[in-house]
């Protein structure tokens, strides 16, 4: 069965390369495993509830980032994204705290 990918766009170029090729340059080596799990969850999700996985600490962002969601990667590092109509957009890998 052919499955459509949910992830449609990236802000962070190294995260995109990691997603497409598995090459982890540009992402912290100690974050690679968690990012791989989170990207896989995003890419198979149909709803935001599908991504509410223990350990990911999924939560909506507020203020200027309203409309975006966040996964905790490690410490202050987050995977942030918009989720609209069953697709993930503008994925970013950032230390935003």
Annotate each predicted stretch with a short phrase:
Residues 11, 54-57, 92:
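A secondary-structure boundary/capping signal
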Residues 23-24, 44-47:
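Generic structural signal for secondary-structure transition and capping sites
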């Amino acid at each position: 069965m052919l499955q459509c990918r949910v992830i449609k766009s990236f802000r962070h170029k190294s995260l995109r390369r990691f997603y497409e090729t598995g090459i982890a340059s540009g992402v912290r080596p100690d974050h690679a495993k968690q990012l791989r799990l989170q990207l896989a969850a995003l890419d198979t999700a149909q709803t935001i509830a599908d991504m509410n996985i223990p350990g990911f600490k999924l939560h909506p962002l507020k203020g200027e980032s309203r409309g975006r969601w966040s996964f905790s990667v490690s410490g202050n590092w987050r995977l942030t994204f918009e989720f609209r109509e069953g697709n993930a957009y503008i994925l970013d890998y950032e230390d935003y705290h």
